[in-house]
Amino acid sequence: MNIFSQHIMAERSQRVLKILCIHGYRQSGKIFKEKTGSFRKGLKKIPVEFVYVTAPNRIPSIESDVEEQFGWWFSTEENTYDALTKSHYCKGYEGTITFIKDVFLKQGPFDGVFSFSQGASLTSLLCAMNSEEGSIIKFKFAIMIAGFKSRSSQHDIFYEKPIKCASLHVYGETDQVIPKENSEKLAKYFENPVCYCHPGGHFVPASSQHRQVYIDFIQEFLSAVDTKVNST
């Protein structure tokens, strides 16, 4: 084996997909990481690095013993959020985008984004920004769990054109927080979306019967990297 071949094999073996993880409303990076332990364990054979971040908007709580919770934006003046009600109010959103851009600059580049609920709604906006020329926010794919189209009127512009980003949309048949119809509607704004409906509710499915869906989707991007290396 020559030195060039050894270099290629080393590059392939060291290549790790880097995925940004965006939590849901009333969560944090820490909480989301704890809740997705089974998900990460199911993907341990795939070379992936997960980066968890916490939204910049703290949700007020009158209970001192409750772990701090955060959101990506609020839909009312009272600093609350309703995912399914149309609103012209979007407090904290600009700060969120500034924060996300900083994450991409300091902790990127990222290959993909993995997100849940309000985080998945935010991710749909990031996917639209992803195709903008010169955007700091750049990634190859997005996995959105219990996602939905943002109901903020300020975000309508992001859904005017088909979103050109590889996407996996996962949602629950019995989800009472974000009914599956909302996730199905979000998927229709994407070009060639991959959809998977599990029989459960509002959570990240991670049992053995579900993990293959994630593996099949993510491995396409590992294969693309291998092909690029082989053609060098």
Predicted regions and their residues:
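Short beta-strand/loop motif that positions the catalytic acidic residue
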Residues: 163, 168-171, 175
